[in-house]
Each structure stands twice: as structure tokens, then as C-alpha cells.
């Protein structure tokens, strides 16, 4: 089989759901389990995508992810005594349809990014982002409505 077909089969076996064969994930790609990751149609990820899928990560149709993006679902206490007990929990991340995530973006646990959204390069997404906007910064904030 072709290299493209082989890569698709590996991703299909690794991930919880892949909507179609129009998926491109450049290497390297890192994840915790894979089975918690659901990817929609016509997905593209540039190199060095990291997804810590302790909880479900859902990515909609027609999404593009730049290089060096990290998506985290794992949470730890900010209290040092509790943190030292190694207690961990997870919160899901949801990314809507038609989303472009720029390079070196970090998406934190429990975040929902709406549809038709652009997240600017280098942003740290700490809270939900609504549909139809451009959002940038650390912390990531809406700077423009689109559509």
C-alpha cells in the first residue's frame, strides 16, 4: 500500500474516530492513548501536534492545526500538598468545524472552541471561544468577529 494509505490506517487504528481518509497528520505526532481522540472530515495537522487525551478530545470537520500545537485535558491541583498526592483528573476539549489553530498554540483542559474560528499563533486558550471569531493572545481573547 502507498505511504499515505499506510499512515491513514495507523491513525484509524490509533484514534477513537476518524471521519474519512482525507486526514493528514505530519510527523511527529504525540498522544497519551489515542482512543479518546475524535477527528472530523478533511483534517490537517502540521508537525509536532501533542494531544494529552486523558479525556475526550473532539475536533470537527475542516480543521487545520499549525506546527507545535498542544492540546491538554489533564488537570492537577495548584495546591502543592494536594498536587504531591499525584491526584489527577481530566476535562474534555472540543473544537468546532472550520477552525484554524495557528502554530505554537496551547489549548488547556475543559475548553470549547466554536466553529468558524481562527486562533492566532502562540495563543494560550484558557477558556471557551465562541463561534465566528478571531482570538489571540495569552490568555487568548476575541479580537474580531467574522462572518
Where is each model-derived feature located?
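Short hydrophobic beta-strand element within catalytic cores of glycosyltransferases
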Residues: 125-126
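Short-chain dehydrogenase/reductase
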Residues: 100, 118, 134-136
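Terminal amphipathic alpha-helical/low-complexity segments used for targeting or macromolecular assembly
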Residues: 1-22, 140-143
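Extended beta-solenoid/beta-helix repeat architectures
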Residues: 111-114, 129
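Flexible, glycine/small-residue-enriched loop-and-beta-strand segment within the central core
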Residues: 29-39, 44-112, 138-140, 144-147
